[in-house]
Amino acid sequence: MRYALLALVLASKLTAADLIVPPLTEGAPQPGKRATVITAEYVGTKVHHLIALPDDWTPDWKARGKHWPVIAEYTGNYYPGSGSTGQAEGAALGYGLTRGKAIWVILPYVAKDHHQNEITWWGDIDATVSYAKTNIPRICNEFGGDAKKVILCGFSRGAIGVSFLGLHDDEVAKLWCGLWAHDHFDGATEWKGTEWGSPLARYRQEAAIRLKRLQGRPLLVTQGSGAATVRPLLAAQLSAPSWTYADVDMQALYGKFPNESVKHPHNDRWLLRDCPQTNAARDWFERVTASDKPSK
């Protein structure tokens, strides 16, 4: 009996350890699954975003007077060493944060040929930013997203992108009620060989201009590494109440790398596992999207 009870406890811990990202479907957007959407502007191409509707979403949401927060996400670069595919289908950060309680949208980086999603860096920057400007309001209108409660998050390349793309100009910056970046941040590191991220002095000047467009809205920055650069950079530019910083101890969370869950400490899967940092990030999301929060 004692061994059976122990086995039951261990099984429950394993079951509860990691959330499972909703499966992909070829059908229309629906609760509990990720659907591929090719918009009217990109019919005939492979440019697409993914969307997963909240677990309690129903087609009669308007009649029910229902609205949901929106978590929009930019993925990391193609980087096999960490398991990052660079594709929208590889995203996990936003779902781990919201757990089926929000509309989850994985935004594309529109390739320069406008025929596919880019898996390394930004593709056509203007087209990528325009895609968000067009489709975030569209998704809110079509599926009941609360336009006052849209958070943009990103991992690695996407962590840079929440500012580089999400604060690219005043129009796109107005879409978000808050930003969350995991592992990296716009202006923290020089990206040699790119036109936008080098030399460092110019890059940081441009990043500082972008960051001013946040205008006091909440920013969460989490880091599995690189805190020595990111934290001082933000502390010099932002007031303490508006931004939150947290380290994520990947070794404490996962042990050795690679393992059955992740290949590398630099990953976006940690939000699928319950831990103090996960709970803190989820609490931040709940606060930022609280029903009584003022309009942005």
Question: What is the role of each PLM region?
Answer:
Residues 16-68, 102, 198-199, 248, ...:
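A domain-start/cap signature at the N-terminus of enzymes
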Residues 3-14:
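Sec-dependent N-terminal signal peptides
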Residues 267, 271-296:
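Catalytic active-site module of serine/aspartate enzymes centered on a nucleophile-bearing elbow/loop
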Residues 171-276:
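The feature captures the conserved acid-bearing segment of alpha/beta-hydrolase catalytic domains
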Residues 57-66, 117-157:
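Gly/Ser-rich "nucleophile elbow"/oxyanion-hole loop immediately N-terminal to the catalytic nucleophile
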Residues 67-70, 74-134:
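Active-site machinery of serine-nucleophile hydrolases
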Residues 159-171:
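Short glycine-enriched nucleophile-adjacent loop
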Residues 66-70, 99-104, 146-150, 172-178, ...:
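Loop/turn elements at helix/coil->beta-strand transitions in domains of secreted/extracellular proteins
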